[in-house]
Amino acid sequence: VELCGIMLRDSAHIQEFEAEWKNRKGKRAGAEPVEPMYTVQDAEAACRLFRGVEYGKRIELAPGIEARFVDVGHLLGSASIELWITEGSTTTKLVFSGDIGNLEQPIIKDPTYIQQADYVFMESTYGDRNHAPRPDYVAELAKILQRTFDRGGNVVVPSFAVGRTQEMLYFLREIKEKGLVKGHGNFPVYIDSPLATEATRIFRDTDPDCFDAQTRALLEKGIDPINVPGLRISVTSDDSRMINTDRTPKAVSYTHLT
């Protein structure tokens, strides 16, 4: 619920910004003003209606209609929804789903598969292809960091604020712990995104039962899986500009949406 709240507010802010830009541009051409699809105020009102639901728990929405949320391993809290609709003596099962995650992603659990449905409605951007073999992200990233830092450069990683940023921190922590980058062991790591910073806080505050076995094992040992030594947070525009003044080879994770 918390992640949905910050993303919905951020999306509303973008809607307002784009509507304002279109109106400034359209005013000169005499175009009719446009309104954002929804505003930050609308997002705030919607957030007050959110109710958290446990995975795997079948709930009654109305007489004859039941639902169950199933973990799909895409993002923290992501779910497919099973819906049972009973009319008379006949029950029909519908499944609604967005993206379904890959196996063995860090931090979050693998997707739970649904075995049966009468009708399925789902996102299908990559529905016609198989995933390539999963690379060793830690080893590959360490090679990139080593090669770039040795030349005095910076590694800039465009990352979605939710999911990818936290995965990147997970990999960077492991790289530093194992000393995989020689001669630059204390290199700084920047998160250059207010939304990613807030999402990372929510990940840290989440019940460990939401994470996969490897992440829970780290937490039981007192290890924060996304706490990278040398991590620096950029929240304001001034913070972002200050990154340019740091001449030390560094890793920067940023998202252009905030």
Place the predicted regions along the sequence by residue.
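Structural motif
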Residues: 42, 112, 206, 243-244
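Conserved small/polar residues in nucleotide/adenosyl-binding loops
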Residues: 255-258
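His/Asp/Glu-rich metal-coordinating catalytic cores
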Residues: 1-167, 173-182
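A short acidic, often aromatic-flanked loop/helix-cap motif at beta-alpha or helix-coil junctions
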Residues: 2, 57-60, 196-198, 240-242
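Long, charged amphipathic helices and adjacent flexible linkers at domain junctions
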Residues: 217-236
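Acidic, Ser/Thr-rich peripheral helices and adjacent loops at domain boundaries
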Residues: 202-223
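Short, conserved secondary-structure transition motifs
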Residues: 3, 163-164, 184-205
